Amino acid sequence: MAKAAKTIKVEQTRSAIRRQHSQRSTLVGLKLNKIGRVAELQDTPETRGMIAKVQHLVRVIDET
């Protein structure tokens, strides 16, 4: 049996207006582009790094 991949749910809580282009691109990479959007992503070090980069714009809802 294969192990189920861990996932993490992230919600965008603040706008990307007047933010650096790299932060906007990071939000798009996280499948977020509007306030209130929720994305379920694989829990990898890369994803964690992207969340850390825009931690002031998003919140982690659930880790499974």
From Swiss-Prot:
Transferase found in the keyword field: no
Residues covered by region (Disordered): 1-22
Which keywords annotate this record? Ribonucleoprotein, Ribosomal protein
Instruction: Name its GO BP terms in alphabetical order.
Output: translation
One Pfam match, given by its short name, reads: Ribosomal_L30
**Segments traversing the membrane:** none
Q: Note whether Ribonucleoprotein occurs among the keywords.
A: yes
Q: What GO cellular component is one of the record's annotations?
A: cytosolic large ribosomal subunit
The Swiss-Prot or TrEMBL record annotates one GO molecular function as:
structural constituent of ribosome
Tell me its family.
Belongs to the universal ribosomal protein uL30 family.
Q: Which HAMAP family match?
A: Ribosomal_uL30_B
Q: How does it assemble?
A: Part of the 50S ribosomal subunit.
Protein name listed in UniProt: Large ribosomal subunit protein uL30
Q: Which gene encodes it?
A: rpmD
